[in-house]
């Protein structure tokens, strides 16, 4: 039983990644559910504080579809997700971690995982922005600790070398997986790897066959992704 949230940074620098998923989403989503009927998927598409309409209205800054097995809802939500601006270099990842942990309708007894598709770093404690947020006291490490206690794993993709250490620390703190990855066109394949690795015995054979296929093709990047996720596979 897998509850998986896919969280997209929708700011400008990440547009190629979410667009790649939009390109393949009609094939990807049915494939994920056909391999694992006990799967539930949630989607979060987010920007930063500067994308909020007001301090009380997230607007397009935080777009969310809670966990569901409705394939059409997932496909439509991803295709309609709005781009955001992002403003400064850091994004409100600290808030994303907090909201996903606290607000997702996680099923009791499920494997709980979040794939964070992002390329920046979280804001530091004390961050302020133009009346939207003032001296924010959200500490991403404390939020990661809360997630870890609830058994929620945060996976990360080391897209930008400047922030590799924070990606790895977040995943390590939550017992998630940090994968070396940059090729936006293969984003949907990383999502598939994450889902297959945690599908239990029913997806183990497909996971291994897919990993072997990438190795045979000489696809080094995807082979590294599958190697990283191998620790999640149930044998």
Feature roles, as predicted:
Residues 1-235:
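Divalent cation-coordinating acidic motifs and surrounding scaffolds
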């Amino acid at each position: 039983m897998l509850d998986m949230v896919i969280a997209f940074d929708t700011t400008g620098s990440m547009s190629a990644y979410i667009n790649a998923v939009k390109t393949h989403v009609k094939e990807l989503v049915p494939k994920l559910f056909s391999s694992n009927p006990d799967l539930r998927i949630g989607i979060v598409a987010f920007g930063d504080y500067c994308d909020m309409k007001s301090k009380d209205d997230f607007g397009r800054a935080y777009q969310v579809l809670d966990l569901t097995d409705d394939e059409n809802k997932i496909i439509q939500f991803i295709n309609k997700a709005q781009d955001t601006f992002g403003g400064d270099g850091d994004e409100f990842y600290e808030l994303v971690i907090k909201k996903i942990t606290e607000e997702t309708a996680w099923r009791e007894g499920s494997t709980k995982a979040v794939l964070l598709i992002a390329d920046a770093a979280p804001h530091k404690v004390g961050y302020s922005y133009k009346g939207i947020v003032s001296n924010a006291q959200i500490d991403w490490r404390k939020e990661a600790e809360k997630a870890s206690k609830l058994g929620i794993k945060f996976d990360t993709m080391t897209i930008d070398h400047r922030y590799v250490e924070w990606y790895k620390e977040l995943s390590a703190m939550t017992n998630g997986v940090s994968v070396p990855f940059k090729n936006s066109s293969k984003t949907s394949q990383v999502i598939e790897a994450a889902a297959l690795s945690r599908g239990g015995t029913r997806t183990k054979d497909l996971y291994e066959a897919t990993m072997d296929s990438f190795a045979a093709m000489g696809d080094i990047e995807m082979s590294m992704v599958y190697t990283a996720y191998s620790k999640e596979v149930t044998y």
